[in-house]
Amino acid sequence: MRIVFMGTPGFAEVILRALVGDKDIEVVGLFTQMDKPFGRKKELKAPETKTYILENHLNIPIFQPQSLKEPEVQILKDLKPNFIVVVAYGKILPKEVLTIAPCINLHASLLPKYRGASPIHEMILNDNKIYGISTMLMDVELDSGDILESASFLREDYLDLDALSLKLAHMGAALLLSTLKNFSSITRKSQDHMQASFCKKITKSDGLVGFKDAKSLFLKSLAFKSWPEIFLENGLKLLEVELVENEKSHKEGEILEIDEKGVLVGCLKGSVRIARLQAVGKKPLKAKDYLNGKRLKIGGILA
């Protein structure tokens, strides 16, 4: 089975590894995003999928086109894929590509929920009790094609973005292999477009928080752990946040307790414990040390 794989981040790399490791599958090409400037020095960083292929010296050609027009359409045709697999690629496939071979997208939600760029973030932010993933036959609309298969699990503990992404990626790898190997016998299911919800691309401003609702702040700390993290108006980052309770009413940002575990901060609804704080341009500090440096005490306001 000849597969062209289209994917970019670490989530997609987990899936690519599973395909490469399967004896029935030959990955005949990787399409991924272009290398991008990263960090303060703006050094070019390759997508994780590309890095995986290069570091393991795999004989898989890598393509990083700016768009999927000619000559890329002809390149895809020449690779003669049985399937084109798309996992967090970051580009919309034009009709000319969709007609080359069945295009199967692995999407990290139980479609039609959370179509779009940030489904895992949305599952966390909405405090979902069930996490899931779907394989879908792609069409010209965004994440609207027929559902092929899906898998899910019941949440037992809160998971941050990295942990949930990894768990869903491994679940998704098994699901995708099942879809590819059983494609001809799978009964496709049309999506109920009336039930669809959409999620946007995450931006830096999404990390801005205040001390209004403890549960919401805690969920944002999980969803935005890797980037953009969560921060106050003055840029102070709140690191390692724990939800303590979500009922009592306090002044916004009121310091309730200070100990070695962190600072207990009140919200209009609930309270959170924050283990570390990081001022703009500074290294992270234990919350207790940061507060001492700012001469903030119990009863003061963290803002």
UniProtKB/Swiss-Prot annotation:
It is an enzyme of class 2 (transferase). Keywords: Protein biosynthesis, Transferase. NCBIfam families: fmt. Disulfide bonds: none annotated. Its EC number is 2.1.2.9. HAMAP family: Formyl_trans. One of its GO terms (cellular component) is cytosol. GO terms for biological process: conversion of methionyl-tRNA to N-formyl-methionyl-tRNA. GO terms for molecular function: methionyl-tRNA formyltransferase activity. InterPro entries: Fmt (IPR005794), Formyl_trans_C (IPR005793), Formyl_transf_N (IPR002376), Formyl_transf_N_sf (IPR036477), Formyl_transferase-like_C_sf (IPR011034), Met-tRNA-FMT_C (IPR044135), Met-tRNA-FMT_N (IPR041711). CDD domains: FMT_core_Met-tRNA-FMT_N, Met_tRNA_FMT_C. This is Methionyl-tRNA formyltransferase. It comes from the Bacteria. Belongs to the Fmt family. It catalyses: L-methionyl-tRNA(fMet) + (6R)-10-formyltetrahydrofolate = N-formyl-L-methionyl-tRNA(fMet) + (6S)-5,6,7,8-tetrahydrofolate + H(+).
